[in-house]
A protein has these predicted regions:
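Conserved functional hotspot residues or short segments at active or partner-binding sites
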Residues: 115-153
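Flexible, low-complexity junctional segments that flank or bridge functional domains
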Residues: 2-4, 153
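Gly/Ser/Thr-rich loop/hinge elements
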Residues: 4-61, 88-94, 109
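Short, well-structured beta-strand/strand-turn elements
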Residues: 58-60, 73-86
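Envelope-exposed proteins and targeting segments
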Residues: 47-50, 74-75, 88, 99, ...
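Stable alpha-helical elements in mature extracytoplasmic
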Residues: 7-14, 62-66, 75, 140-151
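Conserved P-loop NTPase
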Residues: 90-94, 101-131
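Terminal peptide-recognition signature
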Residues: 18, 51, 70, 113, ...
Length: 153
């Protein structure tokens, strides 16, 4: 949660760490030739141990790829709130004046084929945040406490 994203390549790598096989994500550009599919190859490094991914509206882009891939493969329980719903791959084009222009170059799709653009990844278990700010290991972190109790049960 509260992860605004990052590189597509890193989302694929971290997802691959927890999946035995199958598609992680696909990207589709304007032309059919711009379609790319990314698959898990390494195998589940933690051998099927339970995973809970906590999400909220601050979870976007690469973190949505990770949460969505693990959810679609039934490899993790997604707990918390709906994610942001970015759903696009962007590139920075350098400008002569030293600035840059961010350009959407493709949309990404979860293994189910679903686009999360503007809708996000829906949690399996809805637990709304009740704290102001983000404090890991806080006694008032109801989402974290819910996840810990779920893992203990």
């Amino acid at each position: 949660r509260n992860n605004p994203g990052g590189l597509l390549s890193q989302a694929v790598k971290i997802s691959d760490f927890f999946l035995n096989d199958g598609e992680i994500v696909s990207t589709k550009g304007r032309k059919i030739s711009e379609t790319r599919r990314f698959f898990a190859r390494k195998g589940d490094a933690i051998n099927g141990k339970p995973i809970i991914v906590i999400t909220n509206s601050g979870s976007a882009s690469a973190s949505e790829i990770f949460a969505g891939a693990l959810k679609d493969h039934k490899r993790a329980i997604i707990l918390g709130e709906n994610t942001y719903g970015k759903g696009s791959v962007q590139s920075i084009i350098p400008l002569k004046n030293g600035g840059g222009m961010r350009l959407t170059i493709s949309k990404y799709y979860l293994p189910s084929g679903k686009s999360i653009s503007e809708v996000g990844v829906t949690p399996d278990i809805l637990v709304e945040e009740k704290v102001d700010g983000f404090k890991i290991n806080s006694e008032t972190d109801n989402q974290l406490n819910y996840a810990i109790n779920l893992l203990k049960s």
